[in-house]
Swiss-Prot record:
Function as written in the Swiss-Prot or TrEMBL entry: RNA chaperone that binds small regulatory RNA (sRNAs) and mRNAs to facilitate mRNA translational regulation in response to envelope stress, environmental stress and changes in metabolite concentrations. Also binds with high specificity to tRNAs.
Naturally occurring in which organism (per UniProt): Dichelobacter nodosus (strain VCS1703A)
HAMAP family, A to Z: Hfq (MF_00436)
PROSITE patterns linked: SM
Protein name: RNA-binding protein Hfq
Alphabetical list of InterPro entries matching this protein: Hfq (IPR005001), LSM_dom_sf (IPR010920), Sm (IPR047575)
Domain of life: Bacteria
A Gene Ontology BP annotation from the UniProt entry: regulation of DNA-templated transcription
Residue span, Sm domain: 9-68
Gene Ontology molecular function, alphabetical: RNA binding
CDD domains the UniProt entry points to: Hfq (cd01716)
Record's subunit section: Homohexamer.
Amino acid sequence: MSKSQSLQDPYLNALRKERVPVSIYLVNGIKLQGQIESFDAFVILLRNNISQMVYKHAVSTIVPSRNIHLSREEMGLEDEAGEEISAEYTPNAEGQAEATADPLYD
């Protein structure tokens, strides 16, 4: 599993399992809103009133509507001492994610 997948999959899966409403910003500036129904290596199924298949290559940013918590263990990552480090991201007033705990990478 590549390093980019080791963060992406657990993050999307947590959003899916917890049914967190998200805003997905596309590279062309369009904002989509809904809940992540499913995803694979290439697409995200987003559900609002209807289901939409969104190609990942068109996605710029995914912003959750509330805090989510991912531990490094869930992401398959550990620090140098082998200890678990957690990261929590909170959307700010502008809807951008801000780290509110330990950064994932130094």
